[in-house]
From Swiss-Prot:
Annotated TM spans: 12-32, 45-65, 85-105, 122-142, 148-168, 187-207, 223-243, 250-270, 275-295, 303-323, 338-358
Lineage: Bacteria, Bacillati, Bacillota, Bacilli, Bacillales
Organism: Bacillus subtilis (strain 168)
Record function comment: Involved in the germinative response to L-alanine. Could be an amino acid transporter. Forms a complex at the inner spore membrane which acts as a receptor for L-alanine, thus is involved in the stimulation of germination in response to alanine. Can stimulate germination in the absence of gerD and gerK gene products (fructose and glucose receptors, respectively), but the response is improved in their presence.
GO terms for biological process, alphabetical: amino acid transport; spore germination
Protein name: Spore germination protein A2
Keyword Transmembrane helix among UniProt keywords: yes
Amino acid sequence: MSQKQTPLKLNTFQGISIVANTMLGAGLLTLPRALTTKANTPDGWITLILEGFIFIFFIYLNTLIQKKHQYPSLFEYLKEGLGKWIGSIIGLLICGYFLGVASFETRAMAEMVKFFLLERTPIQVIILTFICCGIYLMVGGLSDVSRLFPFYLTVTIIILLIVFGISFKIFDINNLRPVLGEGLGPIANSLTVVSISFLGMEVMLFLPEHMKKKKYTFRYASLGFLIPIILYILTYIIVVGALTAPEVKTLIWPTISLFQSFELKGIFIERFESFLLVVWIIQFFTTFVIYGYFAANGLKKTFGLSTKTSMVIIGITVFYFSLWPDDANQVMMYSDYLGYIFVSLFLLPFILFFIVALKRRITTK
């Protein structure tokens, strides 16, 4: 007779890796284009720094709420604050959002792979293979996921820093000037674009029940957030500094296009975009897996569905919605809507805090 296993609790580094890997999806490949197009200046790096400080502040407030009310996951917090029925409906909408992000990441990955690697392979085959591999990892639970994510994050950072360092051979600081040439207006207008690139930060709202030491919530959430932010800033500066802002606005995948623009002769591998493609297939995969896992977890908590049933629902839903956009441009438009939902979800605990605080005060009287 098999013994019931105790669910694995995550250490701080695993928590950092989950948050960082979840954020490092399609955003890094498309952020330079989206940010430059919206701001119409090369000052996007200032926007990233500014919004980084804003989100660190919101992360801190969210950790204070978690410590004050000690909720294990946002799904339980919803039911306590809004009641079983309304909480379940909002929980279902959150699961739908998770599946929407998973679908976006899946389609973005398929578009990139088809464009750069497998031009003749039907996109449906690429998507189906990706989904099946992801579900296989999800079935193993968060324990399997948490073992892989630190390794993936380390490999990603090392390869990116090497490739970024090499790309400085075509970098021109003058392409980033003048600083604030058109004032603060373009920076304010581009803040919403940056928020969309922070997709993944909201997983911190669902991780506390899985952590060994909940008192370190702010540590793992903030460090998990800072790693992508630093990489985002480096990417933007290097891409715009090398290609110029007007050219970046015309490219769907400007980060990859940068590394296609130069070669290093006399070494074993001359085309370095191959490394970036490998890294980002991994990052698309990790983002899909964690969103799929929490969608399944939400369906289980909200409706009592089994893991098998949840995975079937996730697979079918992601496959259908990932094929919804007609082309890569529609995929990018799809991400805009997800970004607005992300901001709403990240602000939801603040509303629940006042409702739960009032209900608990009434109950204790």
